[in-house]
Amino acid sequence: MPKITKIEVQKKNKERFNLYLDEEFEMGIDMDTYVHFNLKKGQIVDAADMEKIQKYDQYRQAVNVAIQFLSYRKRTDHEVIQHLQKKEISESVIASVIDYCHEQRLIDHEDYANSLKNTMILTTDKGPGIFRQKLRDAGVEQTIIDVYAERYENEQPMEDIIKVANKILKQKKGPTVKRKEKLSQALMQKGYSFEIIKVVMDEMDFSQPEAELDGLLQQELEKVYNKYSRKFSGRKLINKTIEGLMRKGYKYDKIKAKLEESGIVDGTEEIE
């Protein structure tokens, strides 16, 4: 029966050993494998022993891959499994590795959710909705998602959300109704709930200088009028222009006044 004739430390990796049977190189083994089987020179090993050693070493190599992957940041089961699958590690070994990671608390979904919550609140302008999606994508259980999303919403300072809203609002020009609509949409895209958005909207100042609004209306009038003048003329052109500007949030009386001011219609002409 085969006998272990030499066990030597690998030159490039001091945590692994070369195992020789009957003076021939057999395989490399992990430090933990070496200790686990209490391997030593002169030990007799049969085929069944070698199969156990090989399987255990494959498992230990997979554990080390997982530990290396987890060393950069917190991960979930789903993320570790995907990483190990890319390394073409068998499903049975992966399952054992995940069990090991949980036993050693290397993977903890509650800790993961809590850490992500704190990081996102401190470093991003995103709301609970985006937080929920990130946890779902990472494979966190729904019960944990619900608990930590609620904590996220409770812990995120309202003044921070208002700052985000003000930053967005500065970039949105035009009628108040449209600015409100665009701000609401932008906040929803960032993951804020209807309830939070309603509170924020009540805190916002949507006022704009009248001269600025007047200038914007003039610009929009010229664009809309020129666009429809390619297809329409006369009363139809005027009505299409008014409809187009009202869809953009401008009020009828302001549009009518601007049409008259621009000389497109006179003050005596009725506009439908």
Swiss-Prot record:
Biological function: Modulates RecA activity.
Q: What is this protein called?
A: Regulatory protein RecX
Q: Which domain of life is it from?
A: Bacteria
Q: What intrachain disulfides are recorded?
A: none
Q: Which organism is it from?
A: Staphylococcus saprophyticus subsp. saprophyticus (strain ATCC 15305 / DSM 20229 / NCIMB 8711 / NCTC 7292 / S-41)
Q: Where in the cell is it found?
A: Cytoplasm
Gene Ontology cellular component list = cytoplasm
Q: Which PANTHER family match?
A: REGULATORY PROTEIN RECX FAMILY PROTEIN (PTHR33602:SF1)
HAMAP family recorded for this chain?
A: RecX (MF_01114)
Q: Name one GO biological process term.
A: regulation of DNA repair
Q: Which family does it belong to?
A: Belongs to the RecX family.
